[in-house]
């Protein structure tokens, strides 16, 4: 039950109207399952798609065509246009599930979930749906505030790894090296609780600095003279 993509150009508008009518005849969509493109498109609702858009022909964005190249044996073979359900058509579904995996989707997942509704990122419209859920793995959700910087939004259960992440983030945010961070930096960036655990910035900065140096110089701790099994390449290397 998808729009026909091979109808003659002169028949596209009629086909789109038939598709919309078939949805209404079926009583609407109970569950709409979506992916999300790097540009934030859902379906093929590329940047600029309005919230009132319906099933229609649309020109494909360069990024979308490039991402689809592997499925068409080269970018030159990817169609330049497609027929897509509109944003309004999608939003009428009773439930919506958005599925994303991989670190290459992290930036757009953050924008779709936490950014303001924006015609340039169609997925942001889903924030306005009463029953839409994003299903993401750790990699694609890594940039979400609740994962990347949970101390910004609430209480945190601190451990050594999270402390190191927080101090590195603080250095990046303030533009300072780790050893130059002071108490005010911690207080002004939602890290008062972390500062309270250590009393002063200096000792904490030193611990994190030493941990980073140990990682850089810790090659002697890597396996040596042992057999290593590589199960698969990185999923983004295909």
Model-based region annotation:
Residues 1, 5-165:
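Conserved phosphate- and dinucleotide-binding cores of soluble alpha/beta proteins
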Residues 167-238:
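Active-site rim/loop-helix segments in enzyme catalytic domains that contact anionic ligands
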């Amino acid at each position: 039950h998808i729009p026909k993509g091979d109808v003659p150009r002169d028949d596209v508008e009629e086909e789109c109207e038939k598709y919309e009518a078939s949805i209404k005849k079926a009583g609407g969509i109970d569950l709409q399952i979506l992916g999300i493109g790097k540009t934030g498109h859902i379906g093929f609702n590329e940047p600029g798609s309005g919230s009132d858009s319906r099933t229609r022909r649309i020109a494909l964005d360069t990024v979308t065509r490039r991402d689809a190249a592997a499925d068409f044996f080269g970018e030159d073979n990817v169609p330049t246009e497609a027929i897509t359900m509109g944003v309004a058509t999608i939003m009428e579904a009773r439930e919506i599930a958005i599925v994303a995996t991989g670190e290459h989707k992290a930036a757009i997942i953050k924008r779709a979930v936490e950014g303001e509704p924006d015609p340039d990122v169609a997925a942001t419209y889903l924030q306005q749906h009463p029953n839409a859920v994003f299903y993401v793995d750790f990699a694609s959700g890594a940039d979400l505030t609740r994962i990347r910087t949970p101390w910004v939004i609430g209480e945190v259960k601190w451990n050594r790894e999270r402390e190191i992440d927080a101090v590195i983030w603080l250095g990046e945010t303030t533009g300072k090296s780790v050893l130059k961070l002071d108490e005010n930096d911690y207080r002004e960036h939602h890290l008062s609780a972390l500062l309270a655990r250590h009393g002063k910035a200096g000792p904490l900065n030193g611990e994190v600095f030493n941990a980073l140096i140990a990682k850089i110089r810790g090659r002697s701790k890597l396996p040596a003279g042992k057999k290593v099994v590589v199960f698969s390449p990185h999923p983004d290397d295909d």
